């Protein structure tokens, strides 16, 4: 006979949620690039990034991302291409990440603190055609 599973059997982590936390989150049927555009439009005059005391607004961030996405496309990076990001945690990483996803390419994050053999393995395993 068919036995219904409790929500906690299917998703046991929900037992750990404090009461009042919504366990059912809905997401828009949009790409990450579209969500980025919506967010940057909504909060365009607010600060998106503070890095070493320098502030970048959401509007400025979107402009930088769009310029870099255009440059990547001009270099021949296309939808489905894998692009490795070998960058420190910086505004450049954020700009690169969103530029890559906006043109439909796939981000392969690689930590620059890895030793060379780890970086080599990740590059080969991911099939990245380009690296930033």
List where the protein language model places each region:
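Flexible, non-catalytic linker and terminal segments flanking ANL/adenylate-forming cores
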Residues: 1-30
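Conserved AMP-binding/adenylate-forming core of the ANL superfamily
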Residues: 24-28, 33-37, 45-90, 94-98, ...
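Anion (oxyanion) recognition and catalysis
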Residues: 101
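Structured binding elements
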Residues: 104
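Short beta->alpha connector loops at strand-helix junctions that form conserved
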Residues: 110-111
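Conserved ATP-dependent adenylate/AMP-binding module captured primarily in the ANL superfamily
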Residues: 114-132
């Amino acid at each position: 006979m068919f036995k219904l599973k409790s929500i906690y059997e299917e998703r046991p982590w929900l037992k750990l949620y404090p009461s009042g936390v919504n366990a059912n989150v809905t997401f828009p049927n949009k790409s990450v690039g579209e969500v980025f555009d919506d967010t940057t439009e909504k909060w365009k005059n607010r600060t998106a990034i503070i890095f070493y005391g320098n502030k970048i607004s959401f509007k400025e961030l979107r402009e930088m991302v769009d310029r870099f996405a255009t440059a990547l496309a001009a270099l021949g990076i296309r939808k489905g291409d894998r692009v490795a990001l070998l960058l420190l945690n910086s505004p450049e990483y954020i700009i690169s990440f969103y530029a890559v996803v906006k043109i439909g390419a796939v981000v392969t994050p690689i930590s620059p603190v890895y030793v060379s053999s780890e970086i080599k393995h990740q590059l080969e395993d991911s099939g990245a055609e380009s690296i930033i």
